[in-house]
Amino acid sequence: MDDDNLDELVAHSPGPDGPPRVGSSELASDAEESSNGQSGDSEDDTGSEQDDDTDGEETEGLSEEEDPEDRSGSEDSEDGVEMATAAIETQGKLEASSVPNSDDDAESCPICLNAFRDQAVGTPETCAHYFCLDCIIEWSRNANSCPVDRTVFKCICIRAQFNGKILKKIPVENTKACEAEEEDPTFCEVCGRSDREDRLLLCDGCDAGYHMECLDPPLQEVPVDEWFCPECTVPGVDPTHDAAPVSDEEVSLLLADVVPTTSRLRPRVGRTRAIARTRQSERVRATVNRNRISSARRVQHVPRYLMSSLLDETIEAVATGLSTAVYQRPLTPRVPAKRKRKAGRRKKVLGRKKTRSRSSVKSKSGSTRAKKRQHRVRKTKGRKLKNEVTARSRIARTLGLRRPVRGTSMPSVYKPVDPSLGLMRADIGAASLSLFGDPYELDPFDSNEEQSADPPSPLSAKRRVLSRSALQSHQPVARPVAMGLSRRQLPAVAPEPSVEEAPVPDLLGSILSGQSLLMMSSADVVIHRDGSLSAKRAAPVSLQRNSVTQSREESRLRDNPQPGALPSESASGGFVGDRQPNSGLSCGNRTALCCLPARIAQTPVRSDPSLTPRSGLSRTLSDENRPSRTHSSSPQLNGSNVRVSSASTKIVTHSSFPSKNTASGLPQRTGPRRPDFSKLPRIPKIHRDGNKSTQDQAPASGHIVELPSTCISRLTGREGPGQPGRGRVDSEPSSRGPQETGSHTSGSRPPAPSSHGSLAHLGPSRGKGIGSSFESFRINIPGNTAHCSQLSSPGFCNTFRPVDSKVQRKETPFPLFSIKKPKQLKSEIYDPFDPTGSDSSPPSSSPESLGPGLLPSEITRTISINSPKAPAFQTVRCVTSYRVESIFGTEMEPEPQPPSEPVSGMLELLSKGSAEGTSDLEQEGLGEIEPTEIRGSTARTQRPPPPDPWDDEDEVSCTPFFGSEERTVTCVTVEEPGVLPSPDAPQITTHRIVEFRASSRSRSTSSSRSRKKTKKKKKKVAREHQRTRSSTRSGSRDRTSRSVSPVAEEHTRRHRAKTKSRRSSSDRASSQDRAKRRKDRDDRDREHRRGSWGHGRCRRKSRSRSGSPGSSSCERHESKRRKRRHSGSRSRGSSLERDRRHKHRERSRERMDKQESVTRSRERRRWRSRSPSLEHRPRRPPSREKRAHSPEKKGPVREVSPAPATQGESRQDGDHSAEPPVSEVSVLPEVVSVLPEVVVADLNPPEVPPVLAEPVAHVPEDLDYGESVEAGHVFEDFSNEAIFIQLDDMSSPPSPESTDSSPERDFPPNPILPPASLPQDSTLPTIQREVLPIHSEDISKPVPQALAPSDQSLLKQDTVEITTTTPSTPAVVPMTKDSPVLSARGWEAVRPRDAVAQAPLLRSRTLVKRVTWNLQEAEHSTPAALDRDPRTPLQRPQRPQEGDWDAEDRALIGFQQAPFSELPPPIHVLQESGLPDADPSQPPGAPRAEGLPAAGTLHSAGGILAQVYSPNMPPPLAQPSSILPYALVSQPSVQLILQGTLPLAGCGTAQSLAPVPTMPATVSELAVPTTNNSEERTATPKTAAEKTKKEEYMKKLHMQERAVEEVKLAIKPFYQKREVTKEEYKDILRKAVQKICHSKSGEINPVKVANLVKAYVDKYRHMRRHKKTEGGEEPPTQGAET
């Protein structure tokens, strides 16, 4: 644009401009003259006006329209051009903003080549060709035949839109005569007549006219493509006019450069004329162009509210021919121009030296014609000028000169003072990387020019000869003024879309920008999950600081939309925050607004690295810019950005990362927060410092409210640089830098602070966060921080929608929802769960509902959301954010205090968690951060919004999801450093802390938690939280103790309904959590010290535990280490189990991660609907899981010691007792982990059976599950939205759920055993998810609980089997649970179907699956089956595949659990598992507690059932039998999640032991390992040694069974074909199984098994041939198998 402006100025200055232009494009213009002699009809006007056109001042239509006018000889072109220039510019801008989509996508008018958008449409009555109403009416004035097929028509049908109804028909008016007189006619070179204009072809080379009939031979059809007259077709005649091609390209370039040239840019890309270029078409185009320009001018100031009526008026006016008046060039100069042309044109031409060459070339044509041609030649000259203009524009771009901002006459110098992405591209990438080798070629559009200059291609050669008018005939004329939509107003709102559009067709530019990104330091580039790259350092700080710099950036953005990273970054951040923030900031600068959006969009991207925190701010900026890119123009309405550095920075931080800018709101005001940068360097310190710093800032910011949203995004990993809040941090470095660090550290909660303001932003940011998660967490975790940040701003729409900033901005509330959050939103908004207190709160409370409120459930969902893009890291991030636990409270409450910063919110959450034990938080560094204050205030602030749902869940509901607030604390711990620069690292630490905290806090005092919750309640959910808190205290304690008392159960139920005992679990674990937190903090500190990778690892670990697949590996290891340490201190067998679980979880999670993404997306949707309560619970359960770890590792020793003793029976009743609960919590936390999911789903169900008071108490263990889930599952859950959704689904049927929940809770007395099966609990968390539905059914059936211990034992076995069966129908498991008596035969009966359903799956993990299912089924066979069958439908049926997976997992878990509880039962189970598993009683269609839960159950069902359901039975056996079904139901969900996308439940369960091992693993891998892990965990509950041994044994047993199954399946074909003998069959089976069982991976990959078997078969065959009796060494294939 600037180039154009410069050109314009030059053109207007005859002296200097003339010579330079002539000099630069003299040859071109001469050549053009000869070829385009007629090109400039109004040469006088063309002189300067064409320059204007060339400059693109007319942007979209002017240059093209001008030419058509000139060509047509309508002298209006001169004045019209000038007027058109302004009008077109305006119109172009309007078009750019209102019509950001490429015109190529839509049907376009054959005459003006403009897409049908809002203009009135006219169609000839005789054909179905659509034209703009004014185009066809103008056409009909001279010819009444269709321009396309020449069909004669007498009426024109007017329609309001393309394919719209016919509003009216108007007769054709033939005004041809009059106009012919006025206009300067084109005469046929052969006959010399100017009639029959519709058949008077114009040569595309010289513009000479020829009638079709006068040609030799005559043409029968009007050529649509280029047509050259006989003269021009002679080779060599016009080759000299090589400039013409450049002019063609230039035209495109100019059009592209002009902001309004949205449609032209596209035409440039590939639009070609749709109808023949005749005098008629040219005249019509010129007239239409003029009319539109003038009408655009007229409409320019019409209020928007009048626009709608304008459409009708326009139609009327056009129909009545009023627009013809406009067409008749109100500009008087035209008539004189025509006459001048005739009389003095030649002189002018001579004077220009153009006419002569033209006339000489075209001497043949009459004098009139010659004059015309000469004029055209002049036009060509103008074109030459254009050419020069192009060169000029290139130079201008190089110099940083840009089109002056509207309203100013001086060109703006946009050259950034500091290197920006654009500059870097130009200086580093574009210049040196220029594909054309032109060091001066800085603009991608210029590259087009150069291309056109290349004469090689035939098309180029032809184009070379094209006259300007011919070239223009391929370009759309001025866009019709959209009467329906106020085009002008739209532009005002988002005038810059055109800026983005220019880059759209710019493939080269994107490549170059990518090159520049690649050339940047890896530290400055963020790789998003979607594979996109963005510059960490947004625009140079100086750019943002200086309005001039910003302006330049804007121009550069406009001119060089090329910075791929920039636009994307811009789009993501800008769109989110730009609109909102910018509207206020730049609303005064509307003119600049058009340009500004682009500039700003780019500016954020190009923010000074110094200004932008490298990991935090720069990430934010780049992410922010990404939204801006999409939204480039409108989002970056940062007029202030351009005008004032402070404003710009402010805008950048605010508009780019509204969500992330939770703290941004405050920082936003502090535009020049350069200090932040100094803080930013601390990002590495974020581990602890980031937390503290964040907290400090968060309180100061007062954006705590938004913390949830930001944290959620961060947790989700969506809140990356793209997060509006974060991106905008640029100007709030001081406050936001730390906050940002803190917020990232907080688990990507920073956006939350601005969540209320950027609710929409949060959504988009989140969506985007998916893509930019890595950016945010650049330092510590690859993408979590950035992604989280983005999440807040771009709505995972970046992920998914990150690029579509506009959409994201519009959908900001939904981007999260639509992308990954759609489900999240559901969960958050899940009204059905509002009563449950699930995640309803987030919707109600969070700007994200999705903002702070969203945090709790959003964290879960967010992770889920993240999971798709970067499940591993994002999930882990989520875990990190588990401060959300507190944030749940905080999230709801901090929403009002977004300024506080997500970290603040997170800290507040931590503080809340630490409210129970501030010392803990402080130990973890959260306390320092402002544990109580921020937690109290932020938590209250944030919590109040989500509290509605969460309150329902229980006060713990906030924390339940995060394992009471434990998880949040953990996250905060990571942030503990409080150094804004170290948000990433702290986040990692925080995440880890969260996990441990969750379990510790969960076990910790319920009252402490209540206290914390009380604070939260005080803020927003004071009353509800208090009620919840009281519930949590009694209920959570009840849950913790699994109290049998009805009151406790009621509390539990209420908490389930509200928190689903999630918070309870947190409360239980709170004291232990504290100890655990300290350990975690130490561990995390340790890990953080290990290095930035350690940070990422820590964060990932914590997230892993919470279900983050990607991060799970690192975090997992660290978690394991931590857990081992904790286990050691715990002195229980559970520590070993837990360690094992961690390992298993890591493995399974890794596997799960792969499958997780798939399932996650599916399940996430389901979960999102239910996710609110379920997610919160699961989140909390993971927290609990961590707490369990902590207590189990530290405090647990004291608590677990009683627990193991009471595991079998004491737990049954001890569960309800406060102390036992605590100890149980230490062990049970994991069991509860499993149950929490169920509880979550059973929030309502808990109320059902009073008899199940104890089970209900156990269900609170679900809170413990929350602990487990929180640590392991929640992250997985988060990463696997599906599970949450499914849990929600389970939860969705409240009454069935309630019913199920109670029985499940009834069984929880059995889970008293879970102390012993704490590892199982870890598995159970997963089961719990699935269990929800089963739980409901189970609750309705307290029979299993009533069963004698022996019965329960039987149940346990049956449950294990049922677990196998459950895959096909989880409902069966509950039935089995209910009818333990039928256990043996029930599981057997079920087994057949299981075998059938499971058969395919069995290949991958047949044995384990079958066993678990059979046990579970047997257990729940009759009553449970009946009950569950009906109940199951309530639960959303999962995919059959999910069911299968669940079955497998269940089999494993049940198997392991049963053996674990009672070795004999395990063996029995194993044997049974060998049998086909099918639960006939369970309807195959019956949803498996969600199908997904079935999978989850697989892992933890066995352990949980054995532990939870055997209170009456021997602790180990009884629990599995009673709990298994319920766990099974839940577990399938987890398993499915593991397979697909939601390892949440399964991972959660396994998580407590092995944070997310299960979840990260691929589905198949995960299924087996997870199952094994679950089984191991299940076995672990007894004693560390026992658990370990049993776990090992069961694991080996299951592995062996599965190996045997797989080997048999693989060898069967060979044996059937008699390729191997019976002896060989046995040998191969023995060797292969041995080989497989000794594989290091612990996985049984059917493909590898098949390869191994085949290798053995080949070996034996070979040996047979050589008569070798020895089998020899195993084939190397075995190694592959492992």
Curated annotation (Swiss-Prot):
Ranges of compositional bias, category Basic and acidic residues: 1064-1090, 1147-1161, 1182-1197, 1574-1588
The keyword Metal-binding is annotated on this UniProt entry: yes
Here the segments flagged for biased composition (Basic residues) are 336-361, 369-384, 1009-1030, 1053-1063, 1091-1104, 1119-1129
Quick one: where's region Disordered? Answer: 1-81, 330-412, 444-483, 532-582, 605-774, 825-856, 911-1225, 1288-1322, 1419-1445, 1463-1496, 1567-1588, 1663-1682
Bias regions of kind Polar residues — which residues? 609-620, 630-667, 734-748
Q: Which Pfam families match?
A: PHD, SCAF11-like_C, zf-RING_2
Q: Which residues form a coiled coil?
A: 1585-1612
What name has this protein been given in UniProt? PHD and RING finger domain-containing protein 1
**Organism for this UniProt entry:** Mus musculus (Mouse)
